[in-house]
Amino acid sequence: MRVHGLRFLLVLALVALPAAAARGQGAAGKSQEQLRALFDAHKGDFDYLLGDWRFTAENKQYGKFGGFWSAVRLANEGQVLDEFRVVGDSGQTYDLSSTLRSYNALEDRWELVTVGSPNGLQNLGTGQRVGDEMHIEQRFGVGGPNPSTFRIRYYDIGPDHFSWNADRSTDGGKTWVKDFYHIEARRIGPARAIAPLTHADKAAPGSR
């Protein structure tokens, strides 16, 4: 995983998420106890994704393909970073993207941003746990000639397997192509967390 890309996503989270929280606090009207309870209830919603996976996929535009999917928990709870890589038969990379997922207790939802194209930080989405499934709605290709919206469902989730399915809209949600994209993932590595990029010590910042 490229360190500069990871640092960029972490800086984005540190700058953008507190500002969003400040804007939403009054409207949400939740006490600190309620916010803590929501956070504790949902901070592990994506724990099933942690670790390393091999996947097979079928897409109505690109056909059948496969690749690797890895996710790590960040130093702060309720934040997950994953990398999704599509590979060819000889191991060559055809597509690579990273997604930062962070739980927002003020809005009681997960918020996502995917980076994998020259269009910057525009592929935004939101997600919620629904029973035993995770549901996400996310935009892709924003700023390009063919933006689309995906309604994504993670289901049949187990310790070593999960299924992923998406409907797609190219007209802002007016019409949908059902089952446009399907993924089956099998675990090949255990869950893990990323080590903190910074470390506290007894010296105050700027004292060295």
Give the residues covered by each predicted segment.
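N-terminal secretory signal peptides that target proteins for export/translocation
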Residues: 1-5
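Bacterial N-terminal signal peptides
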Residues: 7-17
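Sec/Tat signal peptide C-region and signal peptidase I cleavage site
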Residues: 20-24
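Hydrophobic small-molecule pocket/channel-lining residues, especially in calycin-type beta-barrels
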Residues: 25-208
